[in-house]
A protein has these predicted regions:
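Glycine-centered structural positions embedded in regular secondary structure
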Residues: 177, 193, 211, 226-230
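Short acidic, gly/pro-rich beta-turn/loop elements at beta-sheet edges
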Residues: 170, 188, 212-214, 222-224
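Short, well-ordered beta-strand elements
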Residues: 201-218
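Short, low-complexity, polar/charged sequence segments that are solvent-exposed and flexible
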Residues: 153, 197, 208-209, 231-236
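Short, surface-exposed loop or secondary-structure junction motifs
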Residues: 1-196
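Short, gly/Ser/Thr-rich active-site loops of penicillin-recognizing serine hydrolases
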Residues: 184-185, 219-244
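Short, glycine-/Ser/Thr-/acidic-enriched flexible segments
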Residues: 195-196, 217-220
Length: 244
């Protein structure tokens, strides 16, 4: 199955490992945008790649937004419904959902550091790169399911934890949607988040089956200091090398 497409020069790269990243110019269409609006814009204006595929790495929300559209095309249903039926409901994640354009009437703002609310903005209804609203308890259910292999095969999970952004040698790398810090005795698998006033920390110590989960809805960079807890699991570990 195919989504709308356009050609760009260069070899193939992976959207999910950020080794093929598209430069998305500012979209001037009025009103709230969804994923299809974004794709329509790309098809029309054909934005170029930021770099030659597999030659470098840069984080890209656009890549994940495109992947959500690909999922919809493959499964034949919208991404929020697919996530609910395939992951959230089976794992008992009762307080987790994907926010989309149809949910604007129940929009709950996040907050600036000064407690002023963020109003809903142009890109707030695009999902895949963000817009999963959850709780610490629900995320722990998901985390434990990853350890148990109850809904994803361990072989598939290992693929996600393999380095994919190998543009330069480093202890830091990016897999299939996960950041990783490669240590002599284990990999620390993690991914922090930020959108408007929402901050999140999600760090997995696979060897110890331990996980740090922190969520906040008022912007505060101190949330990322939760990575300092990593020293409790790794003797002599310098937590400052974990990226925000």
């Amino acid at each position: 199955k195919k989504v709308q497409s356009y050609k760009v020069k260069g070899k193939k790269g992976k959207l999910i490992t950020k080794t093929r990243t598209i430069q998305l110019p500012v979209i001037v269409k009025p009103g709230l945008l969804n994923n299809q609006d974004m794709l329509n814009f790309m098809v029309k204006y054909k934005p170029s790649l930021i770099f030659k595929p597999n030659s470098s790495f840069t984080y890209s929300n656009t890549n994940f937004s495109l992947l959500a559209l690909i999922i919809e095309k493959i499964v034949g249903k919208d991404y929020p419904s697919y996530m609910k039926e395939s992951i959230f409901k089976p794992l008992g994640m009762k307080n987790t959902s994907v926010f989309s354009k149809k949910d604007i009437n129940i929009y709950q703002p996040s907050y600036y550091a000064n407690n002023n609310p963020y109003n809903i903005e142009k890109f707030d209804c695009i999902y895949g790169d963000k817009n999963i609203y959850s709780t610490v308890r629900d995320l722990l259910l998901w985390d434990q399911a990853l350890y148990k292999g109850s809904y994803i095969k361990q072989t598939t999970l290992q693929m996600a934890f393999e380095p994919g952004s190998n543009d330069k040698p480093s202890i830091h790398n990016y897999g299939l949607g996960w950041r990783m810090l490669i240590q002599p005795d284990q990999k620390i698998i993690y991914h922090n988040g930020w959108w408007h006033g929402n901050n999140s920390v999600f760090t997995r110590f696979i060897k110890d089956t331990a996980t740090i989960i922190v969520l906040g809805n008022r912007f505060n960079r101190n949330i990322y200091k939760a990575k300092n807890i990593a020293a409790s699991f790794l003797k002599g570990f310098d937590s400052t090398i974990l990226a925000e």
